[in-house]
């Protein structure tokens, strides 16, 4: 085989191994030998595939060029600069002056079905094609100067199956008639407006300026200061089907307040003030029917229907509505003077009726005492 020799260098004092073989004249290190032995002259599977693909491409490239030349024998013409209104019939008539036309292929836009400005024309012979190039190049067709040259292909490529999305813009979107940024903005605006109207804020014109300020309605002022109950009014029960704040979830969250934000927002709007005034002046049977058509679920949750709270607060119970309908006669002006309401709260009406009855009793007692005195004085006088 070979001999192993160890040489000591005096300068660096490093050990150097030299492998000598009778068949090889080169001295190689163990690392290079291992690399050499690891990678055999035979190619790896990756190199095999790579070499096979390279050989295929090299072997097929001349046949491809030959096939392309065979595909266009020389009678196919490439025409550019066409008008968008030109048709295949116009092209055929224009090139029929110089020879016989066998095929016309006009490339159209898939959306508008108009000409994209170029096409392919096949003549019967190569002589006719050369004649068309000499005479019709830079000619005028429908007001446009066209260019005629020899085509690389017989006709245009077959369009890729799928949907044509148009040209790509800088933002990565495709320009097509189906996409409209103005339309998307309007959709988002309408969604945002509908969402805000569902929440009840768009009903109040002064919501953004005043925020969560106190209510301007005397009805809510009386309810806020005189009513210990937290049950909604008949008007709020009527609107509970349109307002999300009266769902069980929002009722649990807003029990600490006497009324919800939507009620305050609607209370400031003149539209709802007019509706409330009209309803408070006339208690129609239709409104009472709507008021009584509350679901049993909400009626069970509403505290105004429980007997315990009827004893505490009689101002919004069904009995008080009956009392208000039959016994509230006189109109009263609100303390702020901003809105009029002819409905008097039952407690206030009862207090006024009691005070009137007391005054009447006092006046009658005083009249009776005066009449008694006058009678006694008449009887005593001679």
UniProtKB/Swiss-Prot annotation:
Q: Which organism is it from?
A: Arabidopsis thaliana (Mouse-ear cress)
Main location per the UniProt record: nucleus
What GO CC terms are in its UniProt record? nuclear speck; spliceosomal complex
List compositional bias (Low complexity) regions by residue number: 30-45, 54-68, 177-195, 202-219, 329-343, 364-382
Query: Which GO biological process annotations does it have?
Result: mRNA processing; regulation of RNA splicing; response to high light intensity; RNA splicing
SUPFAM superfamilies assigned: RNA-binding domain, RBD
Compositionally biased tracts (Basic and acidic residues): 288-316
Tissues in which the UniProt entry reports expression: Expressed in leaves, stems and roots.
The record's listing under Pfam families reads: RRM_1
Q: Where is the composition biased (Basic residues)?
A: 345-361
Keyword Ribosomal protein part of the UniProt annotation: no
- Induction of its expression: Up-regulated early after high-light irradiation, but not by paraquat or high salt.
Q: Which UniProt keywords apply?
A: mRNA processing, mRNA splicing, Nucleus, Ribonucleoprotein, Spliceosome
Subunit structure and binding partners: Component of the spliceosome. Homodimer. Interacts with PRP38, SCL28, SR45, RNU1 and U2AF35B.
Function, as annotated, reads: Probable splicing factor involved in constitutive and/or alternative splicing events. May bridge the 5' and 3' components of the spliceosome.
Modification after translation (UniProt): Phosphorylated.
Please state what the protein is called. Answer: Serine/arginine-rich splicing factor SR45a
- What more does the record tell us? The splicing patterns of the pre-mRNA are similar throughout the developmental period, but change in response to various types of stress treatment.
Where it sits in the cell: the answer is:
Nucleus speckle
Single GO MF annotation: RNA binding
Annotated stretches, region: Disordered: 30-76, 150-382
């Amino acid at each position: 085989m070979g001999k192993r020799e160890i040489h000591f260098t005096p300068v660096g004092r490093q050990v150097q191994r030299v492998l000598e073989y009778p068949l090889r004249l080169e001295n190689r290190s163990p690392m290079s030998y291992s690399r050499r032995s690891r990678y055999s002259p035979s190619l790896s599977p990756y190199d095999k595939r790579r070499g096979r693909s390279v050989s295929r491409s090299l072997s097929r490239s001349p046949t491809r060029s030959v096939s392309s030349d065979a595909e266009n024998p020389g009678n196919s013409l490439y025409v550019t600069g066409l008008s968008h209104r030109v048709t295949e019939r116009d092209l055929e008539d224009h090139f029929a002056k110089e020879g016989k036309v066998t095929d016309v292929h006009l490339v159209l836009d898939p959306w508008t079905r108009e000409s994209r400005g170029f096409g392919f024309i096949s003549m019967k012979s190569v002589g006719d094609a050369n004649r068309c190039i000499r005479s019709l190049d830079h000619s005028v067709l429908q007001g446009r100067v066209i260019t005629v040259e020899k085509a690389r292909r017989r006709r245009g490529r077959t369009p890729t199956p799928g949907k044509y999305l148009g040209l790509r813009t800088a933002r990565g979107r495709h320009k097509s008639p189906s996409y409209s940024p103005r339309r998307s903005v309007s959709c988002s605006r309408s969604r945002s407006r509908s969402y805000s109207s569902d929440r009840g804020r768009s009903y109040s014109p002064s919501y953004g300026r005043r925020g969560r300020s106190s209510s301007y309605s005397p009805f809510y002022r009386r309810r806020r200061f005189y009513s210990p109950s937290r049950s909604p009014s008949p008007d709020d029960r009527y609107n509970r089907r349109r307002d999300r704040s009266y769902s069980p979830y929002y009722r649990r969250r807003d029990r600490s307040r006497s009324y919800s934000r939507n009620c305050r927002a609607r209370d400031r709007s003149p539209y709802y003030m007019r509706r409330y005034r009209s309803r408070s002046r006339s208690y129609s049977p239709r409104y009472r029917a709507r008021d009584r058509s509350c679901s049993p679920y909400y009626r069970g949750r509403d505290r105004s229907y429980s007997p315990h709270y009827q004893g505490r607060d009689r101002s919004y119970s069904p009995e008080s509505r009956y009392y208000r309908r039959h016994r509230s006669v006189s109109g009263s002006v609100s303390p702020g003077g901003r809105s009029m309401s002819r409905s008097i709260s039952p407690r206030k009406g009862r207090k006024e009726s009691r005070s009137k009855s007391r005054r009447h009793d006092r006046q009658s007692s005083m009249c009776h005492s005066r009449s008694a005195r006058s009678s006694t004085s008449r009887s005593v006088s001679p």
